[in-house]
Amino acid sequence: MGSLSSLAAAAVFLSLLAVGHCAAADFNATDADADFAGNGVDFNSSDAAVYWGPWTKARATWYGQPNGAGPDDNGGACGFKHTNQYPFMSMTSCGNQPLFKDGKGCGSCYKIRCTKDQSCSGRSETVIITDMNYYPVAPFHFDLSGTAFGRLAKPGLNDKLRHSGIIDIEFTRVPCEFPGLKIGFHVEEYSNPVYFAVLVEYEDGDGDVVQVDLMESKTAHGPPTGRWTPMRESWGSIWRLDTNHRLQAPFSIRIRNESGKTLVANNVIPANWRPNTFYRSFVQYS
């Protein structure tokens, strides 16, 4: 059975390679370093998310279709799907390492604004990290969807701002809000009795997940085992469990966010679960 698990993990890795990633941008690295000297903000320095901190300098680019959600498949390296629909509504962004955090920044929310370009409105907009871009454009780099980039413009100047290519912006982290939604779990393709992979999404507050654990049941209709098994981050916001035995559902799933807050979705994955299926919980961060 171990071979099934290995093949599934390999398939997931290949699917990551197929994901449409953010595009490279032309820039002057020396100018970027000079412009951002003294920024003095390290978003990896704390174990807890900090909201509404000082506005911090960054640079923004955009990719995909002018009015799109970024990748042509409306996905991204975080594993989120249908980012052109509610609650993402195409207001998405790739993040560089301090924002994407090797996947642990997936789902986090930021207010961004631009003021220097003549086409900028100066109005702040909220974007969600759904993808990665590690091109060294700036210490903090948002590679926005065409939709999000255009929303920073004055009325009627969306295309003109997009033609600027690279712009200076400011950003601050904010709590995510997904009205009407509970935390969701999408069982990924290739999951099987010895390999279980799940996408976690729609977390209010931090928006991200730093640890996921799974609890099996004793039988299909029996009580839970009472034992939590840590899952491993597969990529983005997808977590997996490889085992040497057949997993017994229903599964309860425990998640912990960046601020250390824990939630448990009891029996959220039913005994008759199927791959490529979404299961909504009854829990949400307050």
UniProtKB/Swiss-Prot annotation:
It holds the Pfam family Expansin_C. It is found in: Secreted, Cell wall; Membrane. GO terms for cellular component: extracellular region; membrane. Expressed in internodes. Belongs to the expansin family. Expansin B subfamily. Glycans are attached at residues 28, 44, 257. May cause loosening and extension of plant cell walls by disrupting non-covalent bonding between cellulose microfibrils and matrix glucans. No enzymatic activity has been found. May be required for rapid internodal elongation in deepwater rice during submergence. Induction: By gibberellin (GA3) and wounding. GO terms for biological process: plant-type cell wall loosening; sexual reproduction. This is Expansin-B4. The gene is EXPB4. Residues 194-281 form the Expansin-like CBD domain. CDD domains: DPBB_EXPB_N. Keywords: Cell wall, Cell wall biogenesis/degradation, Disulfide bond, Glycoprotein, Membrane, Secreted, Signal. It is a peripheral membrane protein. Residues 75-181 form the Expansin-like EG45 domain. InterPro entries: Expan_Lol_pI, Expansin/allergen_DPBB_dom, Expansin_CBD, Expansin_CBD_sf, LolPI, RlpA-like_DPBB, RlpA-like_sf. Residues 1-24 form the signal peptide.
